[in-house]
Structure formats: structure tokens, C-alpha cells
């Protein structure tokens, strides 16, 4: 029991433990299941979210697509709306125009109506007056009638009373007394007469009034009618306008409908097109598969047929003992007998071969009978001079199709079929050419019918167009080696020659080649079906080259390209037909032809191919283990010709096969042949090229017409009278072509022909001269190049579209090329090559020197000179382009290019040594002249360089325009040119080593055209001669007053003449390079403009002035004499230049100063100026000062320059006007300044802006043009002297303020430039003793001016952005008589004008860099009248003292508007690119207003200029101080953006007169 308990106790514990573990496991499993459920829920949720995100993405994409579609629709709708808007705008403009017209018409009618109404009112008033007069007259008449009646009654009463009284007294009636009766009667008559007259008068007046009334009524009715008609017309016009509006609406609706319909149609057609494209692609794939299968089958079939046919032909040819026997027999036969008897032998052998073959039912050899063994041996070597190929004599009959003369289509297609199956046999009757003046006899053997066979075999021979028989030995030595090709562009090679008899000897053949004319052979086909069938078969055979053959062909083409002897040889298009020959004979024969190596000239077509004539080596090797039988080369040639006849079928292009009238001659020439040895067999690869050749006799015009009517690529001319033939061909080719542009390229190059074999001694030809006939007119394109070797002239005509480049030959030749052309279709070239003496050890890479004058029609000439000694020099010529210059530079010669107005070329030539040191540079300039110009090139190349230019250009002067004649006039005279001319000094300089010769052409240019000063030229064109006289007088006067000699002659002109006694003017040409040796790259980069090369240095005209007191050098541009001096300081390349020029009232001067940057300067008219240009160190950082003074008359200014480098200041007792323009690396600044003195109405135009001022007094126009990345046109300042009450100043800027004051002129101007818009300009003018207060304020400037009688204070505050950058306070402590001041700062700057004693304190803060500049300027001296304009200059400060009363300080602002910053260090000076450069300084005064008496005023100027150093935008610290005493200083410096200059040439002219001046006694002017 106990034991059981003991035993069961542990088991129970184990079971409990197991249960506990099981419970834990189950709990763990349940937890994991819950976790799995949670994870699955989360995964499902995430998948749902991903699905939602994908749906959202799809929704977004769909929305984007819909939005894009909406955008497209909206764009279309916008375009439609814009179109409708434009239509409505046009309609509105039309309606407005019509409305204006109607209003004008209505206004005219209203005016007429008013006039009529006024006339009506006047008529009515006159009528009323007349009615009133009528009433008065009637009343008067009634009164008169009443008085008359009363008087009558009274008289009657009195009479009655008297009668009664008498009757009463007397017994009877008594008669009145006679006196009373007379009175009564007379009174009655008088009254009756007056009454009648009165009544008549009244009736006339009434009649006139009625007539006037009637006229008035008629005019009123007419006016009413006209009014009614005008109303009707206006209504009709309104109706018409309404109808047009409705019509326009209908048309627009119709347009919209048509657009929709067309859109629908276009969509439908696009769908149809897409369907057709799909169908086409499917058909293309199907056709490609079919053609690929068919090609594979054809390749297999062709390979088998070709191999079998070749083997059979070779075996038959070698197994026929008659060939070997005949070959041995014919070697011992005389040449003449053999030539006459070979026809019958060939025919007999041909028939026997055919009989043997037919009996054995093999492929007939007759299919290759045109290259049978006998005929090939006899005729294969003939005509090697003209490039006849082996065995190609009898192939002319079937040139186009390449068929055998007696083979049928079935035979060619199936090489090995039985003859009995050939029932459809066609015979070919070729037409043979006429062989003139040759001993060759052409026989056509009649066809002989054979028993049991229906075929007719016409055997014909002698169609070879170049039968030039030689002796047998010569034929063995000279296997035909002509390489030519019949290309798809129908290239022809026509052999031209004289009619000479052909002898059998080799020397006679070479010296007297024959001419044979061959007509094109005609082919006759039985039916069109068979013709097309033959073409198809030919095409099938042409497509039988497999991929391996094409790969081998490309590989061999590459290898041959490497093996070319000279760069002039290019390979023609070739076809390689791989042929595997397995011959069981151990015979290795080698034929090494040594024919004439005739280089075939470039055909020059669009493909640019060159034919290549090389020495050909033919090798037909067979290797077998059997015997070692040695045969001669004739038997080898049999096999060669058999293979050639087979390969001939593959060398025809489909175009030539399809043509019915094909070329008469096809030559198949072996180009390369390789033997690839293999196991038990040898593969022979033969590369074949073919060419069509036709011989035409050009001795008569019929043959020449035939030649010129064909599309000929290359013409070879044989004969000694080659140059005569050229003229005939050109003249004949020009008949009937006068209406078109004609160009004939004639290139005649005579040079020895080199022989590869080297067996014969070299002969050299003599220099050859060709003189062109005077009346030869330009003709069609052709190129004649003549080569002479061993007394043989071979002139090749080539119709080309490109200029020929002379390739290196055996000897260095100098070629003069004269090109003449009509329109831009082409040109006429004459290459005249004159070989040098022929040294024996020349390489092939020597070269030639080209001097070219290309004459074309549009009055320009293009002349260039080039040597091609160094390999790799390439000539590129401007063809039919714009007139200009182009520098052609080889890639491998880093020679600097020099470019003047005419161009100068420096070259070195070393011709007789193996090393070549050349720097070829070509400058070409075009001058087109009429094509009637003809020049004789005879002997030109043997003369001096100047003579060559003189002879050519001397004939051009009458046909050139006047300006071009002036430019070229210096080339035709030897003497020194005066001002305004061109002088050229062409001379040869022998090098130090003696092995090189340098030709130096120095060109003196005196006429320049600057685009920026055309207006100045127009203004002062008439006074040029007066200006020249004034300049010369000024220079002489100034030289006579110089008392101290110059420090020395300039470095640029080392070794110049010493000063001589007296003053003399001598003009000489020079070339000044202002770029130090270490700075050529920097300067080149700085002065490089896009698209053209800039010169390394300028070409300037120089006047050397020698006097006892010193030596000066003057450069002349535009007829201004100048004196120049260069001071070179120390090894650190510190140099300075000083300039002074003297001008008359209207002089023009262009100055170009090229230092580290290239600058140009132009002076205002009537100004004297002096320029000091100081450059420190190799960094070429310029320091410039500029002062410009205007005076009424020129006198003798003198300038004194400090010898040490540093900032320079200048002062003078004159008013100044200047322009200072500088450009850095990124932007350019150009100012234009025109100064007029006197009553001138002037207009100055610069760039795209135009300004005009009109006034009675002095006028000044300053134009500032900034060409930079940020700023555009900066502003224009126009200033008029206060000679009138009101001054108008117009500026092209943002805002203009003008004020007119009664006693003075005040102008306050604000100019904003660029994105920052913080440019401020103020002008405060004090006029007389009247105090004026001018105040103007805008968003960025504040000006306060206070004036009193004696003290004036002005405070200027310049605001830039959010910062005050300049504060000024100026106190004027004396009476200012008249001193207008204008302060125009393109950057922030200020100016003070003082009169008497002035004190000026200025504190300037420049931007965030806190650069401060403090100045204290004290000036003493009276002033009469001063104008001051101040603007910030670039790097240096520009100081002016006019009448010792004014000073200008220019401070460059902070980094926002850095004008020009530079770093200056003693050891390293480098330029920092600047962002903006806007500066202008202008000073104007009236004549005589600045004159000072003999008194001279002390002038002391203290300058302290500080700038904090920083990054590229912060100015480097510079401190300079200079105190100078100046009597006169005139300076002008200008830099022009190269992109704004029209002409390509950059010119530099420096004019200075440097002498340490002394005190002057009298007036200056």
C-alpha cells in the first residue's frame, strides 16, 4: 500500500504538472489567436485604407484629366472668344469710322443749312425793308396826288372866279391871258412827267423786290430738299449697317457650324487613317516576312548557280587546249598582224567553244562571250590611259541591262539547263559607235545558223570607246586601272580630246591620245513582258548579297578608308561580290598593273563622294597539292575576265537597267581582292566598282552640245590644247542662258603625277599660266582642273555645287582663286596653280597658299588669303550669305586672329623642311560687283603681294559704289594716304631663323561707321573739310607751344624715328595691341561677342608728329588728328594712356580704348577732350577720368599727366560736358550726348528712343542707355539753357516734373530704374539775386532749397528703399550771379555748385555695408555762370572744376546698385563683376560765359574715397589722393555694348597729347 502510494505520488505530481503546463499552453494559444485576429483586423483595415487611397489617387487622376480637358475646352473657348472679340473690335472700329464719316457729312450739311438759313433771313429782312420803303413811297405818292388835286382845284377855282369877275364886268367870256396859259400848260406837263417817272421808279422797285422774294423762296425750297435727301441717305446707311450686322452674325454662325462639321469630318477621317495605318503596318509585316523568306531562297539559289557556273566556266577555259596553244602562238606574233587577225580567230574560237559546250549540255560559255578569253586578252589592256576596265569592250551593247550579247533570259537565269529547252530566243542587234581616226576596225560577224539549234548568236566586238592599242609588253605592264562608277545620279565621265591618230607605240599614245565618239547603244526587246521579266530577274540577282557579304563589304570599306594615300581620295560607292574559287591547280600568278595614277577629281555633288584611282593588284591564287605548273599572265586574265562577266550582272543599278537609252560605256574595275585561305580551299573576295564612261569629241559644236545637254558629273579633257577647249566649252555652254544666273568654276592646277612603282624617274612640270579670254561670260557650273604629268594634260570638268578645296599635292603650290558669280546660285572660280621649284624630298602633306577674290553680283567683293601648309587647316567660305567678314581658323593652330576693316592676315610659311610652323588665319570680306567684270589672272601669282591686290582691285573701282571705292582706294596706291583714306602696307619680313617668311599686311583705316553715332554723322557731314583744317591747325599750334619734351617714345612702336627739326606730319600704319602677354585669355573672354571673333588688337591710323620739343604719335579716325602716348610702368604691367583730341565746331571722333575690356568712345560736336586711362596690373582694372569742355573756337589745350599710377583728377577753366559709359562682365551702359550751340532745331536718336529739343540758345541732349540683366532704358535728360522764361525738360522715365519760374528755370525730375526704383534726381536753380524756393517731394526723394540774396543753403536727402543713403548740406556764401545746377544721378549721387567761397560737408551712407564717405571741399574764386550736372561714375570718381567754382563727386551706392567695384592690391589686382552702371555727366554753358581773364585761380582738391571691402558686390577699399594743376583737360571715354554695334570690326583709336605743361601766358581760346 505504501509502495503503491510511493509509486503513485510522483505520477500524480507529474500529471498535475502536465495539466498545468497544458493549461498554460492553451492560454498562450488563445492569446496568440486573439492577437492574430487583431492583426488580421488591422491588416484588413490597412488594406481597405490602401484601396481607398488608390481610389483617391485614381479619382485625383480622373479629376486632373477632366480639369485638363476643361482647360483645353476653356482654352478653345478663350480662343473663340478672342476671335469674336477681335471681330467685334474690328466691327466696332469700322462702325466708329462710319459714324465719324456720317458725323462729318452731317456737320458739312448743317453748315450748309445754316448758311442757307442766314441767306433766307437776310432776304426776308431785305424784303421787309423794301415793303416799308414801298409804303413810304405810296404814302408820299398819295400825298403828292392830294396836293396836286388841291392845287388843280385851287387853280380851277381861281380861274372860275376870274372868269366870273370878268364876265360880270364884261358882257362876253374873256380868254385867259396867254402868259397864264403858258404857265398852266407848262406846270401841267411838268407834273405829268414827274408823276410818270415816279410811277415807273416805284414799279421797278416793286419788280426787284418780287424777284428777290422769288429767289429766296427757291433757295429755301432747295435747302429743304437737300435736308430731306440727307435724312434719307442717313436712314439708308443705318439700314445698310443693320443688314451688315445681321450678315456678320449669320456668317459667324455659319463659320461655327462649318468648324464643328469640319471637326467631325476630321475626326472621322483620322479614324479612317488610323485604320489604314494599322492595315498598312500589318501588310508591311507580312510583306517583310515574305520578302525575307524569298531573299533567303534567292541567296541560296544564287550562290549555288554562281558557284556552279563559275566552276564550269573556269574548268572549260582551262581544259581547252586551244586557249593555251593560241596564247603561246600569239606571244610570238607581231603586234600589227595580231591586231588585224584577231577578229576571225576570236569568232572561230567562240564557235568551237559553243559547240563543245552544247554537245556536253553544259552552261554555254556564250553567255560570257563578251568577255571570252581571246577577246579579253586582246582588248582587255587597251585604253589604260582613259581608265578602260579589263574585258569591258564588248559590254556596251547591253549597258543598261547588263545582259550578255548572245545569251537568252533562260540561260542567264538557269546557267546549267539543256539548250534544247530554249525555244524563245531573242537576238540583239546593237548599234555600234563610230570610231574616228583610229586604226581599229569594227566588224560584226554574221550570225551562223547551226543544225539542230534554233538560236542565233550575234558575235560583235569593237564597241570599246577607247581602243588605244599598245604593244603587248605595255599591255602586260599596264592593266587598266581606271576607277569610276555609274551612280544613281546618272554620273557620266566624258573623255574629251583632240582628233589624233593612234599609233601602236606607247609614247605616241601617251602624247597623242585619240578621240572616239560612241553613240548610245540601242536595245530591242521582243515584248514588254520580257523586258519587265528581265528587269525583275536583274533585281533578284541584285538582292542576292547575304548578310555576311555586307559585313565583309563594310569591313573592307573601313580598311580601305584607312589605306587612302592622301586626304583628297574618297571611295566611290562599291558593291562587293564575294566569290569562292576552288581551283585544283597549283598555280599562283600575280599581275601588278602599273598604270597612270590619275586622281579623279571630286564630283562635288550633294553626296560629296570622291572617286579614287589607286594602283590595283590582281591576284588569283589557287592552292592544291598537285603540280607546280607556271602559266603566264594572259591565262590568268582569261579567268579574271570570266569572273568579271559573271560579276558584271551585279554591278548594274536598277535605274540604268530600266532605262531604254542607257549609257554607252560601263567599266567594271577591281578595287580590292583578298584571298582568305582555309582548309583545302581558298576563298577569293573581289571588290568591284563600275562607272559609266562615254567619249565625246568636242572639236565640233555638235559633240559639245551633246556633252552639255547631259547631266554630267565629271569631264576629263585629254590633249595639249586644253585651255583652248575650256573657252570653247564655256562659250558654247552659255548660249541661250543669259537670263539666268551663271557660274563657271574653272580650276587649272598643274602638278606632277606621282607613280607608286617608283621605277621611272620623276619629272616636274613647269609653272603654267592661263589667261582667260576677255569675252568669256559666266556659264553653268563647271570646274576645270588640269594636271600635267609626263607631258600629258588631263583637265577635269566637274559640275559641282560646293567650292573646291585644294588638296595637298607633291609640291607646294600657290593658287590664286578668282570667283565670279551672278546671283546667289553659284560662282565662277579660276584656280591658277603655280608650283614652286620641286624639291625631291617633299611629303604629300605640304600644302598650298590660297589667295582668293570672290566676285559676286550684289556689289560686294570677298577676298581672302590662306596658306594650307599645316594639315588640318580647314577653309570655310561664306557662300551666298550676308555681307560680312569671317575668320577661318584651323583647329590645331592656336593662332590669334586679327581683323581690321579690310582684314589683315599674318602667316608663316616653311615649305622646304619636314617641320611646319604655320599660323594660318583667313579674313574674308565680300564685295559683290556686276558679273561683267573680267580680270586677267596671268602672272598675278608671281608678283608682289601689293601688286596682286592692285591688279585685281584696280579693275573693280569703276564698278563699286563710292564708299567701297574709298575703302579700297588705299590698296591701289603706293604713296602715303591722307586723312580719310585707306592705306595698306604689304611687305615680306624674313624670319630670324631664315626658314620662315612672314607676310605682314598693315592696314590703315580712316573711315568707321558706328551705329550709335549715325545722327552725329548726319549733323556734321557738311563741315568735315572745315573740321579737318581746324584739326590740323590746332595740332600745329599745340605742338608749337609745347616746351618740354615727351618722356619717350611709346613702347608699342619700338625703334621709331627720332624727333627731327621742324614740325612735319607723316602718316603711317601701325597695329597696337593693348593686351599684355599674360592677359590674352582674359581680354579675349571680355571682348568676345556672340557669333563672331573679336580682334586681339585694334587697327588704327596713326599720324607721327615730330617737333624739336618732343615726339608725339597721333592716331587719326574720321579726319581728326590725335597724339598718343603710352607709358608702361614696371614689370607689374601697370600702364596708363592719356588722350587729347582737338575738334572744330562740328567734329566727329570715335575712340576705342581696349584694355581688359573693350570700350568705344564718341565725342560731342565742337568739343575738346582729354582722356586719361590708367590700368593697374594684369587685372586690367581701368581708372578713368573724363572732362569735356565746349568752346566756340579751337585753340591749344595742353594736358599734364602724373607719371605714377593712381586716381587722376582733372580741372580746367571751362564748362564741361561728358559722357562716361562702362560695361563690366554682365551689363553694358551706353550714353548718348548731343550738344548743339546756336539756334538749332535738332533731333537725336539713340537705340529705340527719340528725343527732340528746340530752343534758341544752347541745347543739350543726354541719352543714357543701360543694357543689363536687370535694367532697361534708364532715362533721358534734356536740358535747355535759361535763355527763355520757361525751360522744358522731358525724360523717358517714370515721372517728370516741370516748373516754369519767371526769373529762373527750375526742373525737378524723378527717374526710377529697375526693380528697386530708387533713383532720384534734383535740380535747384538760383537765378540772379532773386531768391527762389523750389521744393519737390515724392515717394523717394525730398528736396529743400532756401535762397536769399547772399546766402543760399540747400539740403538734399536721397532716399533709397527704406534707408537714407545720402545727406548733403551746402552753404553758398556769396552772390550767385547765374548758376543753374542740375544733379541727375542714375545712382545715388550729389553735387554742389559753389560761387566765391563755398564749404560743403557731405555724409553718405551706402547701404547695409555702412560705407561712409566724408568730403570737405573748399573752393575760392569768382564765378560768372555755371551749369552742373552730376551722375555717378563707375569705379573711379569723376571730378570737374569749371572756372575753379564747381566740383562733382560721384559716389557709387551699396550692393543694391553697385555701379562698378574693383579690388586693388599692390600684388594682385582683379576685377569684380558689377551689376549696374548708370552714370552721366553733362555740363553746358553759353558761348563766352565761362571765359576768364588772364587771371588764374588756385585750385586745390582733396579727395578721400573709402569703401569697405567685401564680397563680389561690395567695393574694395581704395584710397587715393592726388593734387594736380591743370590748365586744360578734356576727356571722353565710352564703352559700347558689342551687341549693339552693327559692324563686325572693332577699332581702337587713342589720341593724346602728353607734355608736361607750363604756365600759359595768354587766353586759351
UniProtKB/Swiss-Prot annotation:
The lineage of its organism: Eukaryota, Metazoa, Chordata, Craniata, Vertebrata. This is Synemin. The modification Omega-N-methylarginine is found at residue 1487. Residues 59-163 are annotated as: Coil 1B. InterPro entries: IF_conserved, IF_rod_dom, SYNM. Residues 11-320, 1244-1563 are annotated as: Interaction with DMD and UTRN. PANTHER family: SYNEMIN. Type-VI intermediate filament (IF) which plays an important cytoskeletal role within the muscle cell cytoskeleton. It forms heteromeric IFs with desmin and/or vimentin, and via its interaction with cytoskeletal proteins alpha-dystrobrevin, dystrophin, talin-1, utrophin and vinculin, is able to link these heteromeric IFs to adherens-type junctions, such as to the costameres, neuromuscular junctions, and myotendinous junctions within striated muscle cells. Residues 50-58 are annotated as: Linker 1. Its main location: cytoplasm. Residues 498-577, 1019-1040, 1513-1525 have a biased composition (Basic and acidic residues). Residues 402-421, 1087-1105, 1354-1379 have a biased composition (Polar residues). Belongs to the intermediate filament family. Residues 301-1565 are annotated as: Tail. Residues 1152-1463 are annotated as: Interaction with TLN1 and VCL. Residues 11-49 are annotated as: Coil 1A. GO terms for molecular function: intermediate filament binding; structural constituent of cytoskeleton; structural constituent of muscle; vinculin binding. Residues 401-421, 472-609, 1019-1060, 1080-1105, 1198-1221, 1332-1415, 1505-1525 are annotated as: Disordered. Keywords: Cell junction, Coiled coil, Cytoplasm, Cytoskeleton, Intermediate filament, Methylation, Phosphoprotein. Residues 1-10 are annotated as: Head.
Amino acid at each position: 500500500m505504501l509502495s503503491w502510494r510511493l509509486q503513485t505520488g510522483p505520477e500524480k505530481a507529474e500529471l498535475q504538472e502536465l495539466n498545468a503546463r497544458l493549461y498554460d499552453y492553451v492560454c498562450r494559444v488563445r492569446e496568440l489567436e486573439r492577437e492574430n485576429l487583431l492583426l488580421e483586423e488591422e491588416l484588413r483595415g490597412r488594406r481597405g485604407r490602401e484601396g481607398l487611397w488608390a481610389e483617391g489617387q485614381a479619382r485625383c487622376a480622373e479629376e486632373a484629366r477632366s480639369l485638363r480637358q476643361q482647360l483645353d475646352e476653356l482654352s478653345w473657348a478663350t480662343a473663340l472668344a478672342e476671335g469674336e472679340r477681335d471681330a467685334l473690335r474690328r466691327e466696332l472700329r469700322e462702325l466708329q469710322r462710319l459714324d465719324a464719316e456720317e458725323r462729318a457729312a452731317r456737320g458739312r450739311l448743317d453748315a450748309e443749312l445754316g448758311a442757307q438759313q442766314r441767306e433766307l433771313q437776310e432776304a426776308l429782312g431785305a424784303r421787309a425793308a423794301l415793303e416799308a420803303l414801298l409804303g413810304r413811297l405810296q404814302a408820299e405818292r398819295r400825298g403828292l396826288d392830294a396836293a396836286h388835286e388841291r392845287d388843280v382845284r385851287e387853280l380851277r377855282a381861281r380861274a372860275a372866279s376870274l372868269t366870273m369877275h370878268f364876265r360880270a364886268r364884261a358882257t362876253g367870256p374873256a380868254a385867259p391871258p396867254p402868259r397864264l396859259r403858258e404857265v398852266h400848260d407848262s406846270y401841267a406837263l411838268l407834273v405829268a412827267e414827274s408823276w410818270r417817272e415816279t410811277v415807273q421808279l416805284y414799279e421797278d422797285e416793286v419788280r426787284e423786290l418780287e424777284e428777290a422774294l422769288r429767289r429766296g423762296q427757291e433757295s429755301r425750297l432747295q435747302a429743304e430738299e437737300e435736308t430731306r435727301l440727307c435724312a434719307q441717305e442717313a436712314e439708308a446707311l443705318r439700314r445698310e449697317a443693320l443688314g451688315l450686322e445681321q450678315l456678320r452674325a449669320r456668317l459667324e454662325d455659319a463659320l461655327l457650324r462649318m468648324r464643328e462639321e469640319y471637326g467631325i469630318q476630321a475626326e472621322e477621317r483620322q479614324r479612317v487613317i488610323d485604320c489604314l495605318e494599322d492595315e498598312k503596318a500589318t501588310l508591311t509585316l507580312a510583306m517583310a516576312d515574305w520578302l525575307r523568306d524569298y531573299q533567303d531562297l534567292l541567296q541560296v539559289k544564287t550562290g549555288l548557280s554562281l558557284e556552279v557556273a563559275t566552276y564550269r566556266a573556269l574548268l572549260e577555259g582551262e581544259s581547252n587546249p586551244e586557249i593555251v596553244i593560241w596564247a603561246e602562238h600569239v606571244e610570238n606574233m607581231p603586234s600589227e598582224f595580231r591586231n588585224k587577225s584577231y577578229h576571225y580567230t576570236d569568232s572561230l574560237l567562240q564557235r568551237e567553244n559553243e559547240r563543245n559546250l552544247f554537245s556536253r549540255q553544259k552552261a554555254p560559255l556564250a553567255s560570257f562571250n563578251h568577255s571570252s578569253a581571246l577577246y579579253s586578252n586582246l582588248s582587255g589592256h587597251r585604253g589604260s590611259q582613259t581608265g578602260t576596265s579589263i574585258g569591258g569592250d564588248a559590254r556596251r551593247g547591253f549597258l543598261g541591262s547588263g545582259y550578255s550579247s548572245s545569251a537568252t533570259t533562260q540561260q542567264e537565269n538557269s546557267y546549267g539547263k539543256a539548250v534544247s529547252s530554249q525555244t524563245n530566243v531573242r537576238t540583239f542587234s546593237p548599234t555600234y559607235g563610230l570610231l574616228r581616226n583610229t586604226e581599229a576596225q569594227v566588224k560584226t560577224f554574221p550570225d551562223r545558223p547551226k543544225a539542230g539549234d534554233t538560236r542565233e548568236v550575234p558575235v560583235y566586238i569593237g564597241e570599246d570607246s577607247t581602243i588605244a592599242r599598245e604593244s603587248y609588253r605595255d599591255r602586260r605592264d599596264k592593266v587598266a586601272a581606271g576607277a569610276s562608277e555609274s551612280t544613281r545620279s546618272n554620273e557620266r565621265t566624258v573623255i574629251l580630246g583632240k582628233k589624233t591618230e593612234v599609233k601602236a607605240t606607247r609614247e605616241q599614245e601617251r602624247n597623242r591620245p585619240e578621240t572616239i565618239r560612241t553613240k548610245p547603244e540601242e536595245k530591242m526587246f521582243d515584248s514588254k513582258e520580257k523586258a519587265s521579266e528581265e528587269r525583275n530577274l536583274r533585281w533578284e540577282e541584285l538582292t542576292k548579297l547575304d548578310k555576311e557579304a555586307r559585313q565583309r563589304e563594310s569591313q573592307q570599306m573601313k580598311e580601305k578608308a584607312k589605306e587612302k594615300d592622301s586626304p583628297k581620295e574618297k571611295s566611290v560607292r562599291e558593291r562587293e561580290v564575294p566569290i569562292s574559287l576552288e581551283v585544283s591547280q597549283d598555280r599562283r600568278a600575280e599581275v601588278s598593273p602599273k598604270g597612270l595614277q590619275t586622281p579623279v577629281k571630286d564630283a562635288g555633288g550633294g553626296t560629296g563622294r570622291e572617286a579614287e584611282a589607286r594602283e590595283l593588284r590582281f591576284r588569283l591564287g589557287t592552292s592544291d597539292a598537285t603540280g607546280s605548273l607556271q602559266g603566264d599572265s594572259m591565262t590568268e586574265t582569261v579567268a579574271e575576265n570570266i569572273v568579271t562577266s559573271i560579276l558584271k550582272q551585279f554591278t548594274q543599278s536598277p535605274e540604268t537597267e530600266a532605262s531604254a537609252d542607257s549609257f554607252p560605256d560601263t567599266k567594271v574595275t577591281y578595287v580590292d581582292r583578298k584571298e582568305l585561305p582555309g582548309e583545302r580551299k581558298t576563298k577569293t573576295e573581289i571588290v568591284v566598282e563600275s562607272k559609266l564612261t562615254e567619249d565625246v569629241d568636242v572639236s565640233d559644236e555638235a559633240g559639245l552640245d551633246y556633252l552639255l545637254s547631259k547631266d554630267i558629273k565629271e569631264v576629263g579633257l585629254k590633249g595639249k590644247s586644253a585651255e583652248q577647249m575650256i573657252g570653247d566649252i564655256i562659250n558654247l555652254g552659255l548660249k541661250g542662258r543669259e537670263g539666268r544666273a551663271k557660274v563657271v568654276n574653272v580650276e587649272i592646277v598643274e602638278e606632277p603625277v606621282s607613280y607608286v612603282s617608283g621605277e621611272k624617274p620623276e619629272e616636274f612640270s613647269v609653272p603654267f599660266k592661263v589667261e582667260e579670254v576677255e569675252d568669256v561670260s559666266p556659264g553653268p557650273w563647271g570646274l576645270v582642273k588640269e594636271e600635267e604629268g609626263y607631258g600629258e594634260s588631263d583637265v577635269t570638268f566637274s559640275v559641282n555645287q560646293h567650292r573646291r578645296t585644294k588638296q595637298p599635292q607633291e609640291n607646294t603650290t600657290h593658287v590664286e582663286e578668282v570667283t565670279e558669280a551672278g546671283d546667289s546660285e553659284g560662282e565662277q572660280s579660276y584656280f591658277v596653280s603655280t608650283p614652286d621649284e620641286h624639291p625631291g624630298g617633299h611629303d604629300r602633306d605640304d600644302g598650298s597658299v590660297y589667295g582668293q577674290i570672290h566676285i559676286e553680283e550684289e556689289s560686294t567683293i570677298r577676298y581672302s588669303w590662306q596658306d594650307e601648309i599645316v594639315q588640318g587647316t580647314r577653309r570655310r567660305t561664306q557662300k551666298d550669305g550676308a555681307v560680312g567678314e569671317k575668320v577661318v581658323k584651323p583647329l590645331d593652330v592656336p593662332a590669334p586672329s586679327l581683323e581690321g576693316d579690310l582684314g589683315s592676315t599674318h602667316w608663316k610659311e616653311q615649305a622646304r623642311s619636314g617641320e611646319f610652323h604655320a599660323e594660318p588665319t583667313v579674313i574674308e570680306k565680300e564685295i559683290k560687283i556686276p558679273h561683267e567684270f573680267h580680270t586677267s589672272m596671268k602672272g598675278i601669282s608671281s608678283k608682289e603681294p601689293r601688286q596682286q591686290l592692285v591688279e585685281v582691285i584696280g579693275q573693280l573701282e569703276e564698278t563699286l559704289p563710292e564708299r567701297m571705292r574709298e575703302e579700297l582706294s588705299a590698296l591701289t596706291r603706293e604713296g602715303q594716304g591722307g586723312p580719310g583714306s585707306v592705306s595698306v602696307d604689304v611687305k615680306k619680313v624674313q624670319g630670324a631663323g631664315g626658314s620662315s617668311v612672314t607676310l605682314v599686311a598693315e592696314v590703315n583705316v580712316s573711315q568707321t561707321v558706328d551705329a550709335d553715332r549715325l545722327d552725329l554723322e548726319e549733323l556734321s557731314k557738311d563741315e568735315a573739310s572745315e573740321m579737318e583744317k581746324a584739326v590740323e591747325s590746332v595740332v600745329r599750334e599745340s605742338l608749337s607751344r609745347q616746351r618740354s619734351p615727351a618722356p619717350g617714345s611709346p613702347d608699342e612702336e619700338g625703334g621709331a624715328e627720332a624727333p627731327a627739326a621742324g614740325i612735319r606730319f607723316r602718316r603711317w600704319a601701325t597695329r597696337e595691341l593693348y593686351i599684355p602677354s599674360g592677359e590674352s585669355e582674359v581680354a579675349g573672354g571680355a571682348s568676345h561677342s556672340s557669333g563672331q571673333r573679336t580682334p586681339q588688337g585694334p587697327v588704327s591710323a596713326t599720324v607721327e608728329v615730330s617737333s624739336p620739343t618732343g615726339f608725339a604719335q597721333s592716331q587719326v579716325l574720321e579726319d581728326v588728328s590725335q597724339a598718343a602716348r603710352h607709358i608702361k610702368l614696371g614689370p607689374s604691367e601697370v600702364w596708363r594712356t592719356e588722350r587729347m583730341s582737338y575738334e572744330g565746331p562740328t567734329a566727329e571722333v570715335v575712340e576705342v580704348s581696349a584694355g581688359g575690356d573693350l570700350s568705344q568712345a564718341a565725342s560731342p560736336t565742337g568739343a575738346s577732350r582729354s582722356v586719361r586711362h590708367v590700368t593697374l596690373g594684369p587685372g586690367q582694372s581701368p581708372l578713368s577720368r573724363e572732362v569735356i569742355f565746349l568752346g566756340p573756337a579751337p585753340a591749344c589745350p595742353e594736358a599734364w599727366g602724373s607719371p605714377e599710377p593712381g586716381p587722376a583728377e582733372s580741372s580746367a577753366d571751362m564748362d564741361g560736358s561728358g559722357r562716361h559709359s562702362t560695361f563690366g562682365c554682365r551689363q553694358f551702359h551706353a550714353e548718348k550726348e548731343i550738344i548743339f550751340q546756336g539756334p538749332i532745331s535738332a533731333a537725336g536718336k539713340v537705340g529705340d528712343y527719340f528725343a527732340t529739343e528746340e530752343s534758341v540758345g544752347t541745347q543739350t541732349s543726354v541719352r543714357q542707355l543701360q543694357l543689363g540683366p536687370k535694367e532697361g532704358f534708364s532715362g533721358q535728360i534734356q536740358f535747355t539753357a535759361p535763355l527763355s522764361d520757361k525751360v522744358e525738360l522731358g525724360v523717358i522715365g517714370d515721372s517728370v516734373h516741370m516748373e516754369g519760374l519767371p526769373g529762373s528755370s527750375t526742373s525737378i525730375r524723378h527717374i526710377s530704374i529697375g526693380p528697386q526704383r530708387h533713383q532720384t534726381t534734383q535740380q535747384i536753380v538760383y537765378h540772379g539775386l532773386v531768391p527762389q524756393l523750389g521744393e519737390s517731394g515724392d515717394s523717394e526723394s525730398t528736396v529743400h532749397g532756401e535762397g536769399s540774396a547772399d546766402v543760399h543753403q540747400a539740403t538734399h536727402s536721397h532716399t533709397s528703399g527704406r534707408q537714407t543713403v545720402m545727406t548733403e548740406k551746402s552753404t553758398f556764401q556769396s552772390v550767385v550771379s547765374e548758376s543753374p545746377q542740375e544733379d541727375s544721378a542714375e545712382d545715388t549721387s550729389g553735387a554742389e555748385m559753389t560761387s566765391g567761397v563755398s564749404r560743403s560737408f557731405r555724409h553718405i551712407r551706402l547701404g547695409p555695408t555702412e560705407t561712409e564717405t566724408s568730403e570737405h571741399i573748399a573752393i575760392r574764386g569768382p564765378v560768372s555762370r555755371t551749369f552742373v550736372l552730376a551722375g555717378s561714375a563707375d569705379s573711379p570718381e569723376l571730378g570737374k572744376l569749371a572756372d575753379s567754382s564747381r566740383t562733382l563727386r560721384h559716389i557709387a551706392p551699396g550692393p543694391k546698385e553697385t555701379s562698378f567695384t574693383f579690388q586693388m592690391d599692390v600684388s594682385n589686382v582683379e576685377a569684380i563683376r558689377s551689376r549696374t552702371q548708370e552714370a552721366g555727366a553733362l555740363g553746358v554753358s553759353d558761348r563766352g560765359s565761362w571765359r576768364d581773364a588772364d587771371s588764374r585761380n588756385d585750385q586745390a582738391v582733396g579727395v578721400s574715397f573709402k569703401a569697405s571691402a567685401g564680397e563680389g558686390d561690395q567695393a574694395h577699399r581704395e584710397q587715393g589722393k592726388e593734387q594736380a594743376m591743370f590748365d586744360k583737360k578734356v576727356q571722353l571715354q565710352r564703352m559700347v555694348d558689342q551687341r549693339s554695334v552693327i559692324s563686325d570690326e572693332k577699332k581702337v583709336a587713342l589720341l593724346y597729347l602728353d607734355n608736361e605743361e607750363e604756365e600759359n601766358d595768354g587766353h586759351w581760346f
